[in-house]
Amino acid sequence: IAPERPGADAVLRFCQEHQIQTAVGHSAATFEEIKKMRAYGLGGFTHTFSGMKGFHHRELGTAGAALYFDDMICEFAKQTVSHEAFELAYRIKGSSRIVLTTDCCGLAQTQSCFDHYVRKIRFVKDRDQVCLEHYDGKKEWIDPRDYQAVKQVEMSYAQSVKNMPDHTKVGLYDIMLMTSFNPAHYIHADDCKGSIRPGMDADLTIMDQNLDLICVYCRGKEIRE
């Protein structure tokens, strides 16, 4: 939500009363506006730094608020920020206040027309391929089954996580926190998700030492394509 928009406080109150977790999204909110809205259950920042009012030493803005408030989570779609920007947040927030997310939305699998106005590309299904129609008139086609081609369109969550040790100082344990326990705790689901112990749902992602995916289990059962 953009907390500076008219009616945002009413929406936040409703969500708080119904135990719905809310977060700041693309927003031009000032530091004081976010400080005020925290009383209504505003708990974090989605896609931290992306489309947010920037930091200034006299007006911390949305980005500054994300770093300042210890009790608010910073969600990162890691592929959308520089390594240094993430490193700065990591030093300030620590591993317990960061959640790794993704903005991968399956563009290569679109079944209709998806207009990506930020990238100025339309993704159009063309039989068994996807046509990328650029606003400048250029067209290119990709095969959704071609993994290397799809990687050029958007980075998967798994690949984004895999890149972490190569480009940041974040260790494997902290990566596991940011991708499992922290998100479960953030949405109040850590009583059954986010860790491995008796009584949990046994939702497991098995990876090798290179962080390549081996298999996935949902409630103790292996998921196969």
Sequence positions of predicted segments:
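His/Asp/Glu-enriched, well-ordered alpha-helical/loop segment
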Residues: 61-74, 91-102, 108-198, 204
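Short, surface-exposed secondary-structure boundary micro-motifs
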Residues: 207-210
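Conserved acidic residues
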Residues: 43, 203, 214
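Active-site core of metal-dependent hydrolases
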Residues: 1-112
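Short glycine-/small-residue-rich flexible loop motifs, especially phosphate/cofactor-binding loops
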Residues: 12, 34, 161-162, 181, ...
